[in-house]
Amino acid sequence: GRGAGAKPTGDRAPIATLARVAHHAIPRRYPRSVRLAILAAVLGLALTALDVGGCSGDPPWLVAGIHKIKHIIIIMQENRSFDSYFGTYPGADGIPARNGHFTVCLPDPRINGCDRPYHDPSLVNGGARHGADDAATDINFGKMDGFVRSAELERNRGCSATYPPPQVCLPSGPPDVMGYHDAREIPNYWTYAKNFVLNDHMFEPVASWSLPSHLYLVSGWSAHCKNAEPSSCTNYVGIKPEKSPDQSLGHRHGHHPDQGDRLSAAFWACVRAHGVEPKQIQRPTGLAARQRKAIGQCLAILTPAQRQRVLDHGAGGGGGEGLKLGTYSWTDLTYLLHAHDVSWAYYVQEGVQPDCDQNPDETAAGCAPVAQGASTPSIWSPLPAFTDVKANHQVHNVKNLSSFYRAAKHGTLPAVSWIAPTQSNSDHPPANIATGQAYVTNLINTIMRGPDWNSTVIFLAWDDWGGFYDHVVPPKVDSNGYGLRVPALVISPYARKGFIDHQVLSFDAYNKFIEDIFLGGARLDPHTDGRPDPRTDVREDAEVLGDLFADFNFNQKPRPPMLLPVHPPPGPASTP
């Protein structure tokens, strides 16, 4: 098999160098298929001369059958740890247990005792804070025992008796961060794992919240830029840019983000609790009488000045929908895709997202909803704010989700697709996880029904841990990460059946797979990609990073579609 982080050695070492040189030497005027064919021929001759052809260290683009993949789709959900979704999945590296009983018990300062993992039948969860400081608290220098303590802190923040609080603010009982789900609540996710590939060591790329994870997903880095010049960018993962997070060791730096306006946070939580969308504040037509009455009650929380701003400007007056992302001047993956004539699209479902812009360490309990859509740069859709996307006139490649359904139906999917949800189907607390599962199932069913299924790879993952317990210490690859472990699945007609991939992986592995499939191994490397930026490492080349090619058998007969019900019945219970 293909080992994690395998590097060319001995006679194969020059092959990797030759691959890079040949890749950049082939004129771009040739179509991509021709360039890859030339590259394969050159490397094939070199391998023959060295008598190492067919070794496991061969460049990925020489793997037999790789040409069968024409479409890579990344579906990104939100805020779940691996143990919270697959902690009791048979054969996976799940919650530690012995003789049918969990062996972990995390300190709980509320009771001066400890809390054990438990099956949580609730479809609506609270989670906990999930910023950089919270990751440090949860990891706690590798002890992985700070999750309950971190969640308990939230009980004293952003909670008000004037509206029904989310579960995270309830005054009694253990926080639900120790709860786990199984096939009883998420049967389709478990069915996909049973029939395709489950990655049980997929780590979020950075020990922080949603925005840095989504930036890594499309660019292999998270930074703060002073202007449009790549040289102005400095490392940034959700704490002060001048600080070095080193979160995988649990170091804290004394920086606590501004807690924001609690009255405003309480107002937005109040209207959300009554099922009112931000845009309906100014235009309440269609709302039930009880909802219109609730808006008036919620407005009473605010000061007169705040009330007027909300009535005048809607969600923007509350600090939520007026999200302004920074300028992202470093190089993202679409720059390489565009340079190699590889089509791409970033599909965004219109609606709202719950994460805060100025206050990333809050949960949904303390955030104003943030509007998102194809024309609105957002935390879950950052590409419109990248300067190279604008310079290449590629902003139109960020599309509404309806465009994805049409493309999948008619066989016109681009080579690379990313898909971002809206709040209600994202799995991000307090979203109903059955709603999220139905949304994901519908996406996958649509792909499977379409003409592109036999040439497609689907990667399904969750962007960060959301404050939920996980027992595996994240590997350290640089000062930013990795972050905590998240669920991940590989679905394809060429995916191995029922395979659990134990390799260390991160979202960098998705970029690496895209680069190997479509770009002949070109990397987001400031020394070779033609657009230098100050990033200090090439994440795709991390020694510990595994290889997603291990999840496939390109020689097998393409597997037929496996259409699942959007609203499945509960599956069987699992055991520790």
Language-model segments: residues:
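Compositionally biased, low-complexity flexible segments
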Residues: 1-14, 21
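Serine/threonine-rich, low-complexity intrinsically disordered segments
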Residues: 11, 17-19, 28, 305
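Bacterial N-terminal signal peptides that target proteins for export
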Residues: 26-39
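Bacterial N-terminal signal peptides
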Residues: 37-51
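N-terminal pro-sequences and low-complexity stem/linker regions of secreted or lumenal proteins
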Residues: 55-275, 281-576
